[in-house]
Amino acid sequence: MSAIYNFCAGPAMLPAAVMKKAQQELLDWNGLGVSVMEVSHRGKEFIALTKQAEADLRELMHIPQNYHVLFMHGGGRGQFSAVVNNFLGNQGRALYLVSGQWSSAALAEAQKLAGDTQIDSLNIVEKHNGLNAVVLPDLHKIDADYRYVHYCPNETVDGIEIFDELDSPWPIVADLSSTIMSREIDVSRYGLIYAGAQKNIGPSGLSIVIVRDDMLKLPSLTQSSIMDYRLAVEHDSMFNTPPTFAWYLAAEVFAWLKSLGGVASIAKINQQKAQMLYACIDANPFYKNGVVAANRSQMNVTFQLADESLDGAFLKEAEAAGLVALKGHRIVGGMRASLYNAMPLEGVAALVSFMNEFAAKHS
C-alpha cells in the first residue's frame, strides 16, 4: 500500500512508530495478557505509566517544579470554561486577546459564564496590505486589575501564529492545543497552559493542563468537580476515571519525541516543513496565502486556489495521490495543510510536488 499523508487539523495523524507499537501490544500490554484499555487506572502498572508520562513531559518542556501537570477530560473547549470557573470568582476580571476563531470561542465561553462586566477583550489582528497581521498591544499601558490575560498563540482555522512571547503584568493563560511541543517556549512565563491532545499529543478526549502553584490560590466559582484544578492536583488527575487509552498514547508520543532529540529537534523539522510549503505557495500565482510572513502558522498552512471552481478537483486529485484532509475549515474555505509533529518531511514534499503539478496542469 502506498503512503497516505494525513493533513487533518485534528484529530491529527500520530507518529507511525507509536501507532505500530500500540498495535503490537493492543491485546497484551506490559505482559499482563490484557489491553491497556482494560487495566485499572489505579493499578501499579498504569500508575507507573502516568508517572513516566509526567516526567517525560516535564523534561521535554522544561517545566519548573512550582508547576503542576494535569491530565484532564474535556479537550480545549472544556478548558475554556474551567479557566473561568477556577480563577475568576464572583468579582475577578480577565482580558481576552482575540486573534481568530479559537480565541473568539474562548472569549464567548468566558462571557457566557462570567458576563461582560468581568470580561474584557481586544482584537489583535489587523489588515496590512490586505493580509492578516497580529499587532500585540502594550499590556503594561492598560490600567486594570485582571486575574489573567488569555490568548491563543496559534489559530488553526485562520492559519495565524504568534511567535513573539507575550509580555504581561498579569498571569498569562494560553491555549497551546495546536503548538504544544512544536517549538520551545519558556513555561515560567505562563500562569497556566492548556492543550487538547488531538493535535501534537495523542487522540481526542484528553487535555493537558500545566498550572503554576500560585494560580490555585485564586477564588473560584462554583463548578463541576471534574474540572476543578485543585481537586485534580489533590487526586493526581484521578478524581474520576481518566481517559486511560489516550493517556497511554500520550505517554508513547512523549517517549517518541524524546527519541528524536526533544522539542528543539522537532522544532527544526517543523520549520523546514512550513518553509517548504510556503515557498511553493509564494512561488506560484496559482496559490495564495492571506497572512503576513511574520504570522504565518507553522502548524496550519492555509491557502486558496486562484480559481475556486477548481477546489473540488484539487481535493479529489490530492486524495487519489495519498494526500488527505486538505479541505479548509468551513468558516474560511480554501485549503489547509496541518503540519503537526507527526507529519514527516516526506509528506510535505509529496504535497508540494502535487501542488506544482496541479498548478501546471490548470494554469
From Swiss-Prot:
Pathway: Amino-acid biosynthesis; L-serine biosynthesis; L-serine from 3-phospho-D-glycerate: step 2/3; Cofactor biosynthesis; pyridoxine 5'-phosphate biosynthesis; pyridoxine 5'-phosphate from D-erythrose 4-phosphate: step 3/5
Pfam family, one: Aminotran_5
Keyword Amino-acid biosynthesis: yes
Record-linked PROSITE patterns: AA_TRANSFER_CLASS_5
Cited InterPro entries: Aminotrans_V_dom (IPR000192), Aminotrans_V_PyrdxlP_BS (IPR020578), Pser_aminoTfrase (IPR022278), PyrdxlP-dep_Trfase (IPR015424), PyrdxlP-dep_Trfase_major (IPR015421), PyrdxlP-dep_Trfase_small (IPR015422)
Annotated pyridoxal 5'-phosphate binding sites: G76, R77, W102, T156, D175, Q198, N240, T241
GO annotation terms (biological process): L-serine biosynthetic process; pyridoxine biosynthetic process
Catalyzed chemical reaction(s): O-phospho-L-serine + 2-oxoglutarate = 3-phosphooxypyruvate + L-glutamate; 4-(phosphooxy)-L-threonine + 2-oxoglutarate = (R)-3-hydroxy-2-oxo-4-phosphooxybutanoate + L-glutamate
Keyword presence, Heme: no
N6-(pyridoxal phosphate)lysine: residues carrying this PTM: K199
Keyword annotations: Amino-acid biosynthesis, Aminotransferase, Cytoplasm, Pyridoxal phosphate, Pyridoxine biosynthesis, Serine biosynthesis, Transferase
Cofactor note text: Binds 1 pyridoxal phosphate per subunit.
An example Gene Ontology molecular-function term: pyridoxal phosphate binding
GO terms for cellular component: cytoplasm
Domain of life: Bacteria
Cofactor: pyridoxal 5'-phosphate
Complex formation: Homodimer.
Purpose of the protein: Catalyzes the reversible conversion of 3-phosphohydroxypyruvate to phosphoserine and of 3-hydroxy-2-oxo-4-phosphonooxybutanoate to phosphohydroxythreonine.
PANTHER family listed in its UniProt record: PHOSPHOSERINE AMINOTRANSFERASE
Family: Belongs to the class-V pyridoxal-phosphate-dependent aminotransferase family. SerC subfamily.
Protein name: Phosphoserine aminotransferase
UniProt source species: Shewanella sp. (strain MR-4)
Lineage per the UniProt record: Bacteria, Pseudomonadati, Pseudomonadota, Gammaproteobacteria, Alteromonadales
Recorded name of the encoding gene: serC
